[in-house]
Swiss-Prot record:
GO terms for biological process: formation of cytoplasmic translation initiation complex; negative regulation of proteasomal ubiquitin-dependent protein catabolic process; regulation of translational initiation; translational initiation. It comes from Homo sapiens (Human). SMART domains: JAB_MPN. The gene is EIF3H. This is Eukaryotic translation initiation factor 3 subunit H. It holds the Pfam family JAB. The modification Phosphoserine is found at residues 3, 183.
Amino acid sequence: MASRKEGTGSTATSSSSTAGAAGKGKGKGGSGDSAVKQVQIDGLVVLKIIKHYQEEGQGTEVVQGVLLGLVVEDRLEITNCFPFPQHTEDDADFDEVQYQMEMMRSLRHVNIDHLHVGWYQSTYYGSFVTRALLDSQFSYQHAIEESVVLIYDPIKTAQGSLSLKAYRLTPKLMEVCKEKDFSPEALKKANITFEYMFEEVPIVIKNSHLINVLMWELEKKSAVADKHELLSLASSNHLGKNLQLLMDRVDEMSQDIVKYNTYMRNTSKQQQQKHQYQQRRQQENMQRQSRGEPPLPEEDLSKLFKPPQPPARMDSLLIAGQINTYCQNIKEFTAQNLGKLFMAQALQEYNN
């Protein structure tokens, strides 16, 4: 089950009954060591997610919901979904877990797939690499190994290209999250970088044959668009917003680097003080020995020199991952527009 946090992500706490139910939907390849290699989504699910955002999403406000389906060998089939209702902190009487249980029970009564296989969330200009999403996906994936999170980008979709991606946490990151040790040494030992925190799973959208025939007929009847529109440049607002968000994350990364450098300087300074103290003790013991006096008693250096608390590095990895996402968005945007500029220049030279 999942408990929703307004506007940030959902913190999931899955029950054993849900995990057991998902296990019943597994095929031959549904053993614990298998990985989901493909996500198959019904077209109805995609439309429900889009409709949910259009009805309740506003600006930076995200919408979230539950994904239902089953696992067949190494393929996760998402056949239905339902949204988390929008509510505020004033709605103290609203029980999110009870709401999900009632929804799944109702779906089971009408013979619709009701097995919990993940969740979905909208994003604002690709801003989804957050601690809330990490904690939520870990809870889902820890209870149901095949769980995925679908990230829907309404801004890209509004520009004419459906943006829907499925992500899972990598096995290395799952182990680190289980240990709950995000110190620099632990992350270095696990060899985790921002590039290997999430793994993207390919998505295939499936429709019935009747829907495919209908789409084919509608495509034939639709008017042919003006070919010159293909060379129109996209709005610069998208690029400007991504650059602004990128600069904000770079500032956060800079502040985090300053904190880490301060920790390293304090650690180095303490090591020097500890070494100097040991040398003084050793010299004093040698002098006492030459005078025939007993050496000084041993002292617990860990009490005298308490090591500084290392800063958690998980937030730094998340910021780096979000910076990488913004860079990829900017790269994709500029590549498309530069291609159009070169094509327009070539056509102009040809016509002249």
